[in-house]
Amino acid sequence: MFYTLILENQSGEQVNLSTTANQYKTSKIEGLNPPAGTISTSSYAGMNGSYLNNAFIEKRNVVISFAMRGIGIEKRRHQLYHVVKPSRYIKIWYKTANIDVYAEGYVETCEVSNFEQQISGQISILCPDIYWYSRDIFYAYYSGVIGAFHFPFPESNAPFPLGVYSNSNLFSITNDGDETGFTLRIEALPSDIPQEIVAVTPTIYNENGEYLQIKGDILTGDVITVTTKTGNKTVTLTRNGVDSNILNRLVSGSTWLTLKEGTNIFRVEAVRGVKKLRVTLMHRNSYLGV
């Protein structure tokens, strides 16, 4: 199988472990499969079977075994040490004919045998975030006004639309990976009146009736960014160029919505002004195994 394997540090410096046999020859990559699950059970007193206490997935451990070939091995070994440093952040880029993903973690070890006839090495990377993420970002949009202007520009004197009002409060997006969180951006459409209250208490519903509701006014120029990813759940308001945490405006009963596998349909509502909102949903496909 043809593949590309690149390690990138926090400064953006990279080392390609799949260049040619005269550079690196990767012999084995562990950690591409889904990580093992940890399942805790307790036995029933005097009864067959047991009951489940909890089940979860541990961190991912990516272990790369390789050999170094050709000339200039010592120089390349020091280049490797420069990029892959123990305890430091590292991004793993992995690409095949059908998938292009990355995982993020921290280097546990980077060992190279210096005094053997066949120079070999092994890199161990621990990834607290267990998923592989697609390189591409996928978007879905809702807007109360849909742009209708297009080229070529009409040459007649007849009126033509610059935009049309949307009759639907629905938008959809397809998730080709595993269930995952996403980033939601809610912003007010432009207005001629500074600091005008454009909308009040926007709510996003999924197909199951679960919702995420943010109480309060949205003014001209406001941008609300919601992140629903596990381990990074935030609600941020950007007003006049200043970011502030508005997690306290999340209404009780709200759900941190996620993207299920396949097609997901969402509905946008508000106490008033829903047609004056623009909503953008962004996500990367996430995979437990590649």
Protein language model features and the residues they cover:
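Residues at beta-strand starts and edge strands
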Residues: 1, 58-62, 101, 117-121, ...
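Polar/acidic, low-complexity leader/linker segments enriched in S/T/G and N/D
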Residues: 1-41
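Short amphipathic beta-strand/extended segments with alternating polar/hydrophobic composition
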Residues: 14-23, 101-108, 211-218, 245-252
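Compositionally biased, low-complexity regions
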Residues: 56-57, 61-91, 98
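"Short basic amphipathic alpha-helical interaction patches in structured regions
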Residues: 75-84, 120-122, 137-142
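Short beta-strand and beta-hairpin "edge-sheet" elements
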Residues: 89, 93-136
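Intrinsically disordered, low-complexity segments enriched in serine, threonine, and glycine
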Residues: 140-290
